[in-house]
């Protein structure tokens, strides 16, 4: 029998906790036998003293095991269970293409996603722009969709990693969110509860990233790869660029539209293509669906070219109660804003920098995200035709097209866009879409 205060004292004094001590504490969080004050105290000691790799693995596994873990064995699937997690960004719509692309190549992708957080958009919010789309199918239906379609994107249910929910709520109000072992545990507890064979992590770097510096993004990626592999799931991570909006759009309906256009080949933003392909390649290799980069890319390009990936997306939408002809008639179903017009810069020049975070917050301010959980979202608002770093801007080339609910909202967004995009008299050096691949 352990005492919570003795576990806190041990960590406070700089000692490593045992697997049993960590499990006792995490189960107590779940069962409400550990108080909020005790959770806060342990979180703060971990914040200051860090955790060893074995402690990090134990913490993650204990949080995963605080709820149900999905088991796919009974379905006798003929491919690997694989997924991707992103630390979040602006215009990061990769999940909507990646899931169907990997499923079309023989993987099974049971993606449990989140809502928007701060300046970052949420995959669930984007999908809810599709009329009727059900993000909470029951467990049996979720399994059926994975078996039949190969991919489903759903919200986190209360049975998955319940200890994390309470732990995170306390961290949020005690300035202990930005601790790498705690972030790692929180992310992976939910992902590992999916019963995965392989995982790829997309860790963003830059002005729209969750972590404020390249070094911290790198440290988080290395921690996640180390812990997930320690927990028995083949995992790699990519450090990808978030110094500009990733897609050509930012919002909900506008990003869904771009995802469909990407899958059908109607329009593919080159940076979005680079990042999506790179993540899919990792999933195919880790899932043993391809032996190397070249084979993986060839398979992925084939399912884009022959329409199979778009077909899988359409089947997923229909299986999750959206329209059965969504891919063919997306504009008929997606909401459109009352006012859509371009915003131009006040001067001419090349785009040298972008405050991606501020652009994400501008979408939230227009009603495209939540400031608090109870807010309702206006799925129609956002930006399209986003200019990119290095673009030459003048009276002919707008910074973006703003989709707003009225003139006042448009004016506020236009002011935010102009303030967030910096022009210079010479073009900046180009930045890669993918900085680094981390395998251990």
From Swiss-Prot:
It comes from the Bacteria. The keyword Transferase applies. GO terms for molecular function: 1,4-alpha-oligoglucan phosphorylase activity; thymidine phosphorylase activity. Pathway: Pyrimidine metabolism; dTMP biosynthesis via salvage pathway; dTMP from thymine: step 1/2. InterPro entries: Glycosyl_Trfase_fam3, Glycosyl_Trfase_fam3_N_dom, Glycosyl_Trfase_fam3_N_dom_sf, Nuc_phospho_transferase, PYNP-like_C_sf, PYNP_C, Pyrmidine_PPas_bac/euk, Pyrmidine_PPase_CS. It catalyses: thymidine + phosphate = 2-deoxy-alpha-D-ribose 1-phosphate + thymine. Its EC number is 2.4.2.4. One of its GO terms (cellular component) is cytosol. GO terms for biological process: pyrimidine nucleobase metabolic process; thymidine metabolic process. The enzymes which catalyze the reversible phosphorolysis of pyrimidine nucleosides are involved in the degradation of these compounds and in their utilization as carbon and energy sources, or in the rescue of pyrimidine bases for nucleotide synthesis. Homodimer. Belongs to the thymidine/pyrimidine-nucleoside phosphorylase family. NCBIfam families: PRK05820.1 (NF004490), T_phosphoryl (TIGR02643), Y_phosphoryl (TIGR02644). This is Thymidine phosphorylase. It comes from Salmonella schwarzengrund (strain CVM19633). The gene is deoA.
